[in-house]
Structures are given as structure tokens and as C-alpha cells.
């Protein structure tokens, strides 16, 4: 399956289709969008975003705790879309505040 991913970035919103077996960060880059990242392994907060609609599977990550995930935070480098999803990017400062 493939889902519509909408990213709300500081530069504005971008939308693209993302297969459910491709990480959102990888697909965004494939489509020419620059997003912050560091480890690419779900072990830091550089790529953190916030899901405002839809669902993701980020079970490959280990940095976020249950409360942070419940608040909507997502690591885009290990997030697969599970539905059409909207994510606010560049949320590392908010996450670590």
C-alpha cells in the first residue's frame, strides 16, 4: 500500500506518496525534500517531527519513550506510514525542551 504523506516544514507544506515499507525520511529525500537527520537509526532526536493526523509505525526506533510517542512525536528516519499522515517536521527543540 502507498499513502499520502504531508510534511509541514518551516518553508511550507509538501506532499508526496510513500509506500508503507519505506521510511518517511527516505521517501522525502527521494522526492527532493531536505529534512533534518543525524543517526538514521531511530537513536537520536535530530529528525523528530509531530504527527498531527494519521498513523505511523516507528517500532524500529528506540529513542522516544511511550509518553513522547503518545504526544505525537515521531522519528521520521524510522517511521513507516500506516495511513495518510500529516507530520510537522523540525520538532527536535520542542521534543528536547
Swiss-Prot record:
Q: Where in the cell is it found?
A: Plastid, Chloroplast
Q: Where does the record place the 2Fe-2S ferredoxin-type domain? A: 3-93
Cofactor(s), names only, from the UniProt record: [2Fe-2S] cluster
Q: Which Pfam families match?
A: Fer2 (PF00111)
Binding site residues for [2Fe-2S] cluster? 39, 44, 47, 77
> GO molecular-function annotation terms?
2 iron, 2 sulfur cluster binding; electron transfer activity; ferrous iron binding
Q: Which UniProt keywords apply?
A: 2Fe-2S, Chloroplast, Electron transport, Iron, Iron-sulfur, Metal-binding, Plastid, Transport
**Could you give the cofactor binding note from the entry?**
Binds 1 [2Fe-2S] cluster.
Q: Would you kindly state one Gene Ontology biological process term found in this protein's UniProt entry?
A: ferredoxin metabolic process
Gene Ontology CC: chloroplast; chloroplast stroma
Where is it mainly found? plastid
- What NCBIfam families does the database record attribute to this sequence? fdx_plant
Record function comment: Ferredoxins are iron-sulfur proteins that transfer electrons in a wide variety of metabolic reactions.
Family, per entry:
Belongs to the 2Fe2S plant-type ferredoxin family.
User: What is the protein name for this chain?
Assistant: Ferredoxin
Species whose genome carries this gene: Nicotiana tabacum (Common tobacco)
